[in-house]
Amino acid sequence: MNTLFMHCRPGFEGEVCAEISEHAARLGVAGYAKGKPQSASAEFVCSEEGGAERLMGELRFNQLIFPRQWARGGYVELPERDRISVLLAQLADFPVFGSLWLEVLDSNEGKELSTFCRKFEVPLRKALEKAGRLVDDPGRPRLLLTFISGRRVFVGVASASNSALWPMGIPRLKFPREAPSRSTLKLEEAWHQFIPREQWEQRLGDDMTGVDLGASPGGWTYQLVRRGMLVTAIDNGPMAESLMDTGLVQHLMADGFTWQPKQPVDWMVCDIVEKPARTTSLIETWLGEGLCREAVVNLKLPMKQRYAEVRRLLDRMEATFKARKIRVSIACKQLYHDREEVTCHLRRLDLKPR
């Protein structure tokens, strides 16, 4: 139970290691991080008993940037037959669980195991319920079984309220056929990640206004229109006719980094390919000058020290807003639909309600 196991995007294992090591050092949890390149996972092995539990207790999962999912536990080697009996024996010292997720890594090997997991889950679930190890109670810990192979599994536990929203941190979003580009799924995932579902009507209402900077062809604009917002799309490139036909979109041929609205808007979204430091300046202007209430903005990460750069820019934003004496909540996550980038959500907390 003394290893913290984390899923991530393949190629970002080093970022997960850097991030969790920084948090562990700050909290005084001794150990070391490791992650095989392109494995889609990383671990923090704690040197002292209870270290992994303390990390998960002190940290909020939604404040971590690069991990998609986490669990504390250890590896179990399984026989070719009667895997369930071995797992039941291993779980004897674990708490009673309120839910069960079988997970695989986001790799070719992991995808090959997904069929096995679907078939294995039904008899395993029945056996756990019969043994009194699994009950229907969302308040109890979640059992997370990450299969590395059919014979090797990481048996982990996590709080259902302090871990990923979906198995492996991968949302099952359906691409809408009428959307102009697949980038639309990035913004839809951001809504789920950063805004509690019960607040959607209030914060993503059809009486709101939005701006999409670098909008062409309209993947992110589509999500705003889908919520019924009046949208100003800023881009020198063309917009999808289907969006223009809704009557909810005004397309202005302008530079997304220099254009500003005459009146404040509710939402600003931006997925422009640009150096992250320049995009950060854009965020500081829009939130700092009250041009929008909330924003979802992607920071592109072409550099090598990706976690260090993201951390530097987030700290810079926080210091900028503090110096201006304005209250802004800042969240950042590498979403499943992100590539070499992270998604930031910002919200002014000191503006009067609409």
Swiss-Prot record:
One of its GO terms (molecular function) is S-adenosylmethionine-dependent methyltransferase activity. S-adenosyl-L-methionine binds at S183, S216, P217, G218, G219, D235, D255, D271. Keywords: Cytoplasm, Methyltransferase, rRNA processing, S-adenosyl-L-methionine, Transferase. It comes from the Bacteria. It is found in: Cytoplasm. GO terms for biological process: methylation; rRNA processing. The active site is at K300. Coiled coil: none annotated. Monomer. Catalyzes the 2'-O-methylation at nucleotide C2498 in 23S rRNA. This is Ribosomal RNA large subunit methyltransferase M.
